[in-house]
Amino acid sequence: TTQAQLFSLTDFLQLDDVITKVECFDISHTTGDKCIAACVALSQDGFDKNQYRRFNISGITPGDDYAAIGQAVRRHYSRAVEEGKKLPDVVVIDGGKGQLRIAKECMNKLGLSNIPVIGIAKGLGRKSGEEKIFLNLQKQPLAKEQHSPAIYLLQVVRDEAHRFAITGHRAKKRKTLLKSDLESIEGIGPAKKKN
């Protein structure tokens, strides 16, 4: 069950309080174009799709995943703090030490230094199970058991964030392509394009 996996993750991270909510971020773009960040939420009852969020990333150098993750984390948690929303017990970043460092710095600046941040770095050949897991700003990855419920949970949350980011990116790309196709047709005005 998800609850058992959250207990396992609590033990794996050696936290005092049992984890009840995890949020995970991922970035999707095509060579820096139409960059989307996604955040998914998981609680004891499973994924909470009402808390999923996507962010259109702008004002950064195309392809700069560090700036993109920073913008998404900053926007998401500054709003959550402002609105008094329940914060996660753990934040997961689909990325290595660089993305993790940026996310942790953003959390610290927002006064959320007490929330652990995990980075999942892709392993050799990007194969599932070969990723390295980093906690906060530790230099060495955490030692992990290959088939533990905690690792499985992190992989599932990461994969869901990845899926949500990619579907958002593809929708944005499709919308742009459709819009440019309509603009090239003579005789179609602004009112027709909207419909």
Predicted features and spans:
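Acidic, glycine-enriched active-site microenvironments
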Residues: 1-195
